[in-house]
A protein has these predicted regions:
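A structural "hinge/loop" feature
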Residues: 28-44, 67, 93, 143-153, ...
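Gly/Pro-rich hinge or "lid" segments in bacterial periplasmic/extracellular proteins
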Residues: 62, 151-211, 216, 342-343, ...
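Surface-exposed binding/hinge segments that line
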Residues: 72, 116-166
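Alpha-helical secondary-structure segments
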Residues: 97-103, 131, 185-186, 214-216, ...
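Ligand-site clamp/hinge motif
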Residues: 204-250, 292, 380, 389-391, ...
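Structural transition elements
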Residues: 300, 317-351, 368-373
């Protein structure tokens, strides 16, 4: 069930625009430096400055070469990639096809959460040191998009540092690759003090040309919204993201700040357990979410425009589908938000055998997305008008 699309906003101190060092703050810290361990937005965003994929998105979300220079279909299920020559990892080790094969085997290990990005790929074959064949179990139209987040590690470095296996983050395992990096990317992570700061410096030996003038980055996670904004206004940091929507208008009018904003490709949605026969935190006789009428009633009860206006302060877009504008496959015809219909929702619940409504628990993060807990609480209040009684279980993510 889709709710809305985020519109990201970042504020920068005007004095930082010519600086070589960028002091950046956001709400969350990374979870690990292991690029295959945790599918977490902040972690992926930062770690991908050190590690690179075979292909990457440009600023318009179009696929362009990265560690692969070209690719072509050999047959409907096989894509041949030519790899970039004369690329070295940060420790000086040359990049070859062996590193791609190793990374493919590694990312699929069950203790990680990044397997989705090589989903459908059956095998990667080495043709020579700079040519590989990626073989899928069936035609795979999303292969290149997924490979944007399939980051390549050095086989030699992982073997040397006993990091052939992905860190078991859930078991609180600490490995060398979880606290150190060795990629081919534009920045070298020099230091990470969890929940305090992360320091990066430009990789002078990078195969590509660095965009912009930033040679050093100091990233500081600041959970408190007021503290993060105060750090920006005082000059302790140069840029902040994850801004509270209620403060955006005020900050826009601050002469010493510049704003960068635009739509994200993230869609916020509610996921329901449709697989279990009965719910852990709901009616014990049956799983109400298996009935499409219940799910439709829940969707019809949500006023997406009210969330956009009152909670997100017009920094979101109502959504009806999971695919965001700008992403391949988006359809404006399908993304038409239907008006809220409380009476229609009540009728659907009655038809489904629940004239007195339904009850369940809604798990919701309170530190991952902008206004995440507030959005969940608003949805619960909207549901209540249709007889849908949900208990909010807000929790920290990570």
């Amino acid at each position: 069930m889709t709710v809305g699309l985020g519109v990201s906003a970042a504020f920068l101190s005007m004095s930082s625009l010519q600086a070589a060092e960028l002091k950046w703050a956001a709400q969350n810290d990374i979870l690990t430096l292991d690029p295959h361990a945790q599918n977490h937005a902040t972690t992926n965003n930062i770690v991908s400055h050190a590690y690179e994929p075979l292909v990457r998105f440009d600023k318009n979300y179009q696929i362009q070469p990265a560690l692969a220079t070209s690719w072509k279909n050999i047959n409907p299920t096989t894509v041949r990639f030519k790899l970039r020559k004369n690329v070295r990892f940060h420790d000086g080790t040359p990049f070859t096809a062996e590193d791609v094969l190793f990374s493919f085997d590694r990312i699929r290990q069950p203790q990680g959460t990044m397997q989705i990005y090589v989903g459908g790929v059956k095998e990667i074959k080495k043709i020579d040191n700079f040519t590989i064949d990626v073989i899928s179990d069936k035609p795979n139209p999303t292969l290149l998009n997924n490979f944007n987040t399939f980051l390549i590690m050095s086989k030699a470095w992982c073997v040397k540092n006993k990091s052939e296996k992905i860190q078991d983050y859930k078991a609180k395992e600490i490995t060398y690759a979880a606290t150190n990096t060795n990629g081919t990317g534009p920045y070298i992570i020099k230091e990470w003090q969890p929940d305090q700061k992360l320091v990066m410096t430009a990789n002078k030996a990078w195969w590509d040309k660095l965009q912009g003038n930033v040679t050093d980055v100091v990233y500081t996670p600041i959970k408190s919204d007021p503290t993060r904004i105060a750090a920006l206004l005082s000059g302790n940091v140069d840029a902040v993201t994850d801004l509270p929507t209620q403060d955006v208008a005020r900050l826009r009018n601050t002469p010493s700040l510049a704003v960068l904003d635009g739509p994200e490709v993230r869609t916020i949605f509610l996921a329901m357990d449709q697989g279990s026969e009965e719910l852990k935190y709901g009616p014990k006789d049956k799983n109400i979410f298996k009935d499409v009428r219940v799910r439709k009633a829940m969707s019809m009860s949500i006023d997406r425009v009210a969330i956009q206006r009152s909670i997100m302060r017009d920094l979101s877009l109502p959504a009806s589908i999971l695919v965001a504008p700008g992403v391949n496959g988006y359809s404006a015809d399908l993304d038409k938000v239907q008006p809220t219909d409380i009476e229609g929702a009540k009728k659907l619940l009655t038809d489904a055998g629940y004239p007195n409504g339904v009850e369940f628990t809604l798990d919701c993060p309170n530190n991952r997305y902008v206004n995440d807990e507030e959005v969940c609480q608003a949805i619960i209040n909207m549901w209540a008008k249709a007889g849908i009684k949900a208990k909010l279980n807000a929790m920290n993510f990570g």
